[in-house]
């Protein structure tokens, strides 16, 4: 990933990075380009956060967003899972696999003067677009849960080996086509 004007996810560039967006595709266009995050910072932020808000669209055109845990290792794939084999998320994905993933973190609000509307929020956000597919391979599902436990669990936890309930979960792999990272230092930018 690079600054929005230089490319990022969606096909290899000369630098080995993935283009962020095509100039004609509004998904990756950022209004305030000075807040655009460099490639390495965007990847690290996406890897380090804990909750992804995943947006789909239902059959009637209504947006549907769910918070999910996820694994991202710095490449062009993001892994998510649900345990529901009959829910809205799965129905929406089966009809239209294109999703938008948002990962964000808020910092403090800087008080503005002389009016409240002059205040500004410190924040970081990453938005990733791309299709998802369902992964049925048990080895990949086991890998995912190993990664989840490493990311979210406590190092002192011990378990019996194996994952006997793998068939109860649905593992999704998002192929990231476009991504943008944005950071604001509030009033200190």
Indicate residue ranges for each PLM-predicted region.
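Anion-coordinating catalytic cores for phosphoryl-, nucleotidyl-, and glycosidic chemistry
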Residues: 12, 34, 43, 90-91, ...
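An N-terminal domain-cap segment
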Residues: 25-75
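A generic structural signal for short beta-strands and their flanking turns/coil linkers
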Residues: 50, 66, 74-76, 95-102, ...
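A sequence-level detector of short linear motifs
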Residues: 65, 79-80, 134
């Amino acid at each position: 990933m690079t600054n929005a004007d230089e490319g990022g996810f969606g096909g290899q560039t000369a630098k080995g990075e993935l283009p962020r967006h095509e100039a004609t595709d509004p998904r990756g266009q950022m209004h305030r380009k000075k807040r655009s995050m460099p490639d390495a910072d965007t990847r690290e932020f996406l890897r380090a956060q804990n909750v992804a808000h995943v947006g789909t669209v239902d059959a009637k055109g209504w947006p549907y967003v769910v918070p999910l845990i996820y694994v991202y290792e710095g490449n062009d794939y993001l892994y998510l899972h649900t345990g529901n084999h009959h829910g809205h998320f799965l129905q929406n994905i089966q009809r239209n696999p294109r999703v938008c993933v948002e990962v964000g973190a808020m910092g403090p609000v800087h008080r503005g003067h002389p009016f409240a509307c002059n205040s500004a929020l410190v924040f970081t956000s990453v938005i990733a677009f791309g299709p998802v597919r369902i992964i049925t391979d048990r080895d990949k599902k086991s890998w995912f849960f190993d990664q989840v436990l490493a990311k979210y669990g406590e190092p002192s936890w011990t378990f019996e080996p194996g994952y006997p309930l793998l068939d109860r979960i649905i593992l999704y792999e998002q192929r990231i086509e476009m991504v943008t990272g944005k950071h604001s230092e509030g009033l200190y930018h």
